[in-house]
Amino acid sequence: MIGGLKSCIEQPSLPKPSTLLPQDKACDTGGKRIFLDVQSTTPVDPRVLDAMLPFYTTVFGNPHSRTHRYGWQAEAAVEKARSQVASLIGCDPKEIIFTSGATESNNLALKGVSGFKLKEGKAAHIITLQTEHKCILDTCRNLEENGVEVTYLPVGNDGVVDIDDVKKSIKENTVLVSIGAVNSEIGTVQPLKEIGMLCKERGVLFHTDAAQGVGKIQIDVNEMNIDLLSMCAHKIYGPKGIGALYVRRRPRVRMVPLINGGGQERGLRSGTVASPLVVGFGKAAEICSKEMKRDFEHIKELSKKLKNMFKKNIEGVIINGSEKGFPGCVNVSFPFVEGESLLMHLKDIALSSGSACTSASLEPSYVLRALGRDDELAHSSIRFGIGRFTMAKEIDIVANKTVEAVQKLREMSPLYEMVKEGIDLSKISWTS
């Protein structure tokens, strides 16, 4: 039915928003402000907005209405977008379940799988990492309160998990291993293929939170033996409020839904699918499929430039994470500088001291502490996010302003003065 409706979404009279929002204007910094916080969100690509707007005005039908043209048009558009998203990760379109975002997808994966086991009266054990996103860790803590056993594995000082630790942690009642593709704070890329192979050999489901990985690094769920994968649109230059969970069909992943209702999305996520958001997600995925390699090389070049400028001009600077991590996430510790103070000195630059979900907390980053960083170093860290629309001249501005701010703040630090005078702080006996 859907194949015969492709013509329904051909609308020659639809508005062309690109004439109102050209790409250079959409990403204009206004000459002052610079956005380097792409791990928290990304600007909507103007081509994505072009694709979305007609579905707010002309093609506004409910995609679940099967009795008239408005519904057929919306349904055809949703299914096209489902195919675009599926193509990005190498799966069947029927394996894509649309959600409100990666947080919901993660909740559905963890609670859905463990909930099915508990419903059968069986014990459930989940394995994850100490450095996972807060929505994974909080969901696991919630599951622990409901009888699910959870193992939180440590990582190395580069943020990468030891495969042997995963292997040793798998037990008879282990139902799921949940390990993120790319860490949102330090950009560490986990060995998904090796983990997936291990899980397949041991008969355990493998879930990955790929919100920071999809569209940025190559991910193929079949090659990597991934059974469940969470993603969202607003991390790949699409709209906020829409995400997806890939759920393998063969062999079938058994799970219970979080939301009951009309039985949409294979009964796993009831509720009317927001066709404008889904269309935007699909277009963003299509662009990533075509331009991922170019984006990666652009980001890699700017990342190298930023790191080199810091290393050349700031004494003792520490780049956190793995050298083989995603280059667009540059987490830097500036010893003897308070991270929050540095952010205040760089108020015209959008940066973060950690995940957007935890950056309001004054606690040092739990991710950096898991890497073995002490509280002082963790407090001195800033994340620089480089994306598709970041320009080389912006990197120059950011690097120069950061160097200047670090030098000013260090001049006010008595500890830094002591270090410059050759005093070994570790040998000082501090009194309270």
Swiss-Prot record:
GO terms for cellular component: L-cysteine desulfurase complex; mitochondrion; mitosome. It is found in: Mitosome. [2Fe-2S] cluster binds at residue 357. One of its GO terms (molecular function) is metal ion binding. Keywords: Iron, Iron-sulfur, Metal-binding, Mitosome, Pyridoxal phosphate, Transferase. It holds the Pfam family Aminotran_5. The modification N6-(pyridoxal phosphate)lysine is found at residue 235. This is Cysteine desulfurase, mitosomal. Belongs to the class-V pyridoxal-phosphate-dependent aminotransferase family. NifS/IscS subfamily. Its cofactor is pyridoxal 5'-phosphate. It is an enzyme of class 2 (transferase). SUPFAM superfamilies: PLP-dependent transferases (SSF53383). It catalyses: (sulfur carrier)-H + L-cysteine = (sulfur carrier)-SH + L-alanine. Its main location: other. NCBIfam families: PRK14012.1. It comes from Encephalitozoon cuniculi (strain GB-M1). The active site is at residue 357. The gene is NFS1. One of its GO terms (biological process) is [2Fe-2S] cluster assembly.
